[in-house]
Amino acid sequence: MAIYYKFKSARDYDTISMDGPFITVGLLKEKIYETKHLGSGKDLDIVISNAQTNEEYLDEAMLIPKNTSVLIRRVPGRPRIRIITREEPRVEDKVENVQADMNNVITADASPVEDEFDEFGNDLYSIPDAPAVHSNNLCHDSAPADDEETKLKALIDTPALDWHQQGADSFGPGRGYGRGMAGRMGGRGFGMERTTPPPGYVCHRCNVSGHFIQHCSTNGNPNFDVKRVKPPTGIPKSMLMATPNGSYSLPSGAVAVLKPNEDAFEKEMEGLTSTTRSVGEFPPELKCPLCKEVMRDAALASKCCLKSYCDKCIRDHIIAKSMCVCGATHVLADDLLPNKTLRDTINRILESGNSSAENAGSMCQVQDMESVRCPPPKALSPTTSAASGGEKKPAPSNNNETSTLKPSIEIAEITSAWASAEIVKVEKPVDASANIQGSSNGKEAAVSQLNTQPPKEEMPQQVASGEQGKRKKKKPRMSGTDLAGPDYMMPMGPGPGNQYFNGFQPGFNGVQHGFNGVQPGFNGFHHGFNGFPGPFPGAMPPFVGYGFGGVIHPDPFAAQGFGFPNIPPPYRDLAEMGNRMNLQHPIMGREEFEAKKTEMKRKRENEIRRSEGGNVVRDSEKSRIMNNSAVTSSPVKPKSRQGPPPPISSDYDRRRRSDRSSPERQSSRRFTSPPRSSSRKSERDRHHDLDSEHDRRRDRPRETDRKHRKRSEKSSSDPTVEIDDNNKSNVFTRISFPEESSGKQRKTSKSSPAPPESSVAPVSSGRRHHSRREREMVEYDSSDDEDRHFKRKPSRYKRSPSVAPSDAGDEHFRHSKRSKGERARA
């Protein structure tokens, strides 16, 4: 059996066991206090209510049945019942009498103690000395001797012993009670306020006992204020100055204060004065004509004189006299306009706080409002700056120039006391008529003044310490168009013409329109150079790669073919000779350039192979067709069937043998074959081979023509020369059977005589000689292979005069060679 309970804020129920079927409310509260550790129940109370019916059990004797669920909540405890004791007035009267007698005795004896201690209770933990004990004895003597209780009470209430013993009739449990009762609420204790101080308490303001200090009648009177001094810890005596109103106590008993630091104060004041301006430093344009001070809230008299004044000064003047300073009487105070420009100028000068002439000159720009009514035409004045001579130079004008207009703009630089070397610049406008009539005269005068101006002397400027910068003087510089021939360093730009003649602009492929006269940079040069009229009327002649007097760079001039070198190197792109002439192509990188270069080389090699291979094939085809036609001709005419061979002299045989043995000829034949690209060759070797091959191909026609002329001359002079029989025959004829060799020898001996001269006349065309040259090289290669395989003896190179060559043998030799070359090519 149990009772279920929980707080309202709890989630689960707790149980309290019980013995019977019922339990009282008081017993249930005690068990709840015990289980929840709520103390004895004196500080708080618990209200119990039914969880289902919300019925509160207010009576502690009320019975609660078992298995009931209740809710509990805490409430403040009930007020305690005070204990009231009966007072004994007789004992109190005796105590008061005893205390009154003791106060009289203590007041008389405690005077030396007050001299030693400035207040009672300062030395709280000292042992009472003999006079205090003597006063206690006197108090006991004054009390009745037969009353023991009175003596004990008097001993307990002795004021000298209040610091270590607390009376039973104290009004609060505070710790501070009895330790100098000068504070509110009985010192640092608390409780009900005590209006009557304890015996022996003396007010510190008036030195009268009977009241606390907060009840003293002298509160608020400065004559009774207590001065508190402190020791000058860490302060040297040299920095202390004795005064009656000091706060530091000196060893002599006087009081002192700190001396002011004059040096630091002067430095601070100097810093403040350096950032402020005096009234005399401001220009007169910023001062009010009435008060002679810097204008405050500058206002403009818009109806009369258009001058600026202080707003207060001019307003008071108009209200008092009903007239302006200039004498106009039709003005009102409402007609004044604020001069914003002047106000901003004054504010900037005051805020700047420095004496820089640059800042002052830029800020002190005063514009008179008369220019608003009569704005003069803006014109440049030809007067030079007054910085050179220190004097103002008037602008040149005509005699009939009117002087009715006042100067509209005056720019003055502030001349301060520490910057006395500044120069005032005044810029005056020029009349419109004077500008129109004398513009040319003024321009000439300005130019003459600029040219004839003496050298300026630099005047030293005395600048203050707070100045931020110096005024920079602009030096006159010549314009770019006035430069002549010596300054011809003009960059190569995209313009159509170059006025300084330092080469040609890109994109001018031989046509330039900028050379129809003498260029501006050529002072003193005539139209034609050294008698050359030039390709255009009055233009420069084409300089074929030659520099002219150090002015013209010897780089390409205009067209591509007019530059160095005159003969371009082999396999060079002519566009490379120009100065970036091929601008239509985009700028390529190094990789793209190398790839393009390799591709061009490969194309050239392919062209060379095709040209050489085509010539050889064409020559071989021609010879084969001729032989076939000779073989297939009519058998009636055997001589016409066999074409007469060309005359071959002994010189030709010797030249062939020398060509076979000479390394130059071998190298030339080696290069006639298509070049094989080797991966081991570097780029430099490949370029070198291509250049050398190009040179040999270029020299090959000349050598062929020269040899042909020699052969033609010899053949014409000696047409009946016998044909040498030492020509090489085919390898198959040399290894044939004896019957065939003897038959061939007989056939050769019966050959016909030499053909006429007209049939062997050489053809003068280069193609014919070139094809013959190719045939000879092919024949030599085949014979060389035969010699290498069959190891020919050196005796075969010797001539045998006994055997005469025949036409049939020579024709058979050539036919066999051609057929072998064709078979090898196929």
Swiss-Prot record:
Q: Which GO terms describe its biological process?
A: cellular response to paraquat; mRNA processing; negative regulation of response to oxidative stress; positive regulation of proteasomal ubiquitin-dependent protein catabolic process; positive regulation of response to oxidative stress; protein ubiquitination; response to cadmium ion; response to hydrogen peroxide
Inducing or repressing factors: Repressed rapidly by oxidative stress such as paraquat, hydrogen peroxide H(2)O(2), mannitol, drought and cadmium ion CdCl(2).
Tissue specificity: Expressed constitutively in both shoot and root tissues.
Q: Which PROSITE patterns match?
A: DWNN
Q: Which UniProt keywords are present, listed alphabetically?
A: Metal-binding, Nucleus, Phosphoprotein, Stress response, Transferase, Ubl conjugation pathway, Zinc, Zinc-finger
Q: Which domain of life is it from?
A: Eukaryota
As stated in the Swiss-Prot or TrEMBL entry, residues carrying the post-translational modification Phosphoserine are 278, 397, 800
Under which EC number(s) is this enzyme classified? 2.3.2.27
Q: Which catalysed reactions does the entry list for this protein?
A: S-ubiquitinyl-[E2 ubiquitin-conjugating enzyme]-L-cysteine + [acceptor protein]-L-lysine = [E2 ubiquitin-conjugating enzyme]-L-cysteine + N(6)-ubiquitinyl-[acceptor protein]-L-lysine
Q: What happens when the gene is disrupted?
A: Increased tolerance to paraquat-triggered oxidative stress associated with PRMT13/PRMT4B, APX1 and GPX1 accumulation due to increased histone H3 methylation (H3R17me2a).
One example of the protein's molecular function in GO is: ubiquitin-like protein ligase activity
Pfam short name (any one): zf-CCHC_2
Q: Which residues form the DWNN domain?
A: 3-76
Q: Which InterPro entries does this UniProt record tie to the protein?
A: DWNN_domain (IPR014891), RBBP6 (IPR033489), Zn_knuckle_CX2CX3GHX4C (IPR025829), Znf_RING/FYVE/PHD (IPR013083)
What ranges of residues constitute the CCHC-type zinc fingers? 203-216
Q: Where can the motif Nuclear localization signal 1 be found?
A: 668-675
Q: Mind telling me which SMART domains this protein's record contains? A: DWNN (SM01180)
Q: Name the Gene3D superfamilies on file.
A: Phosphatidylinositol 3-kinase Catalytic Subunit, Chain A, domain 1, Zinc finger, CCHC-type, Zinc/RING finger domain, C3HC4 (zinc finger)
Q: Which regions are flagged for Polar residues bias?
A: 356-365, 396-406, 435-454, 625-635
Keyword Repeat tagged: no
Tell me where in or outside the cell this protein is found. Nucleus
Residue stretches of biased makeup (Basic residues):
790-799
Q: How does it assemble?
A: Interacts with PRMT13/PRMT4B in the nucleus.
Protein name as catalogued:
E3 ubiquitin ligase PARAQUAT TOLERANCE 3
Organism whose genome encodes this protein: Arabidopsis thaliana (Mouse-ear cress)
